[in-house]
Amino acid sequence: MDDTSGERDHGLQPLDAMMEQWGLSNHDLVEASPEQLNHKQVQKGRKGRQLTLHTMQKVMRAFNIAIWNRLKKEEKETFFEYPHNWLFNYSKGYEAGRVDPNDGLKEVVRGR
């Protein structure tokens, strides 16, 4: 193991907790993605292995689409799409402790 590998491992990401809160699996994101996204990329993103900006954005789009597909029409109107800097703590503009505007929707969707 070289010295740089520790710099690329950022530990569990907010994405991991948010996927659990929404009741999503890696497969849900891969299935929802219109792009070429694979299970390995999603897993690396969840566990904190540093992704390129392009891959972070792919994962972010798949995450938002997977949630969107579970929402009813009236819920879609209030859904706040997550930017990548809410999902990865090493991305530029990340702020810990943000209040999630979708907390109410999470409970409704998980209850189904």
For each feature predicted by the language model, list its residue ranges:
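A short, Lys/Arg-rich alpha-helix, primarily the initiator
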Residues: 1-32
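Residue-level signal for the short linker/turn that defines the boundary of a DNA-recognition helix
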Residues: 13, 24, 37, 51-54
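The DNA-contacting recognition helix of HTH DNA-binding domains
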Residues: 26, 39, 67, 81-84
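DNA-recognition alpha helix
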Residues: 27-37, 60-66
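Key DNA-contacting residues within the recognition helix of helix-turn-helix
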Residues: 30, 39-43, 57, 71-72, ...
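Recognition helix of helix-turn-helix/homeodomain-like DNA-binding domains
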Residues: 34-51
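DNA major-groove recognition helix of helix-turn-helix/homeodomain DNA-binding modules
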Residues: 53-73
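Short amphipathic recognition helices of helix-turn-helix/homeodomain-type DNA-binding modules
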Residues: 69-108
